[in-house]
Regions:
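Short internal beta-strands
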Residues: 130-142
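Phosphate-binding active sites in nucleotide-utilizing proteins
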Residues: 118, 124-125, 138-141
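Short glycine-rich anion-binding loops that position phosphate/pyrophosphate groups of nucleotides
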Residues: 5, 112-114, 179-183
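Glycine-rich phosphate/diphosphate-binding loops that line cofactor/substrate pockets in enzymes
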Residues: 95-107, 126-127, 166-172
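Peripheral docking tails and interdomain loops at the edges
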Residues: 154-155, 160-212
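ATP-dependent carboxylate activation and anion-phosphoryl transfer catalytic cores
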Residues: 1-103
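A general structural motif
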Residues: 86-92, 111-115, 132-135, 154-164
Length: 212
């Protein structure tokens, strides 16, 4: 198998530009130049049109797999959204990928110590938009110390199941869960929270740059 690392990018660009790049490239290989094919080297820019592709994952079909996205993780598919506005194109792509996008509700936050400072302005933004913030004890204390009203949820390791029950009953709209890189156990609270979110189709973020 030869994979030039463009198996998904080329189809995306073909849809966005209207040019069948695989056909064009094949003809070039066979000796037919772009000029002979009547194609300009520079594709004409389409005015006021944004195309966005987002990854799609199959965590719900893979039992016991941690939904944390490590650097080597690869998506199992992609979805495309397009619109005259970038924000709407992103929104459409997220919806097409199967993500539930809510404008209000409750966010459950479980942030690794190394990520707390970076996460602070993101959580504050959700709070300012009117979202209810729930967090495990350590994260909740950190957010409260920065004047973000946060409801404390008991850790699973303490014997409580209130977090999982809340997710299963549809009381949580988003889960933001990051982990310490040296902790990968399936016995951790974070792992169990992420699996519960996946199994109940709750939108989850494991990387802060995605939240941004």
């Amino acid at each position: 198998e030869v994979n030039p690392r463009s198996s998904r990018t080329v189809p995306f660009l073909s849809k966005a530009t209207g040019y069948s790049m695989a056909d064009i490239a094949t003809k070039c290989i066979l000796g037919e130049s772009l000029k002979d094919q009547g194609i300009s080297i520079i594709c004409p820019k389409e005015k006021d049109r944004w195309y966005v592709k987002v990854p799609a994952f199959s965590f719900s079909k893979l039992n016991d797999l941690d939904a944390y996205l490590s650097p080597e993780m690869k998506s199992t598919g992609e979805a495309i959204g397009y619109d005259k506005k970038l924000t709407r194109a992103i929104y459409k792509a997220l919806i097409a990928s199967g993500m539930n996008v809510a404008n209000y509700g409750t966010i459950l936050v479980s942030i690794a110590d190394k990520d707390k400072e970076e996460a602070l302005p993101l959580i504050r933004r959700f709070y300012q938009l009117g979202f209810n913030i729930e967090a495990t004890e350590g994260t909740a204390k950190f957010l409260r110390s920065h004047n973000i009203k946060t409801r404390i949820k008991q850790k699973l390791s303490s014997g409580s199941t209130e977090i999982l029950t809340s997710i299963r009953q549809g009381h949580v709209n988003y889960v933001i869960s990051t982990r310490d890189v040296d902790i990968a156990s399936q016995q951790t609270d974070g792992y169990k929270i992420r699996r519960c979110a996946v199994e109940n189709n709750v939108t989850m973020f494991t990387a802060l740059d995605t939240v941004k």
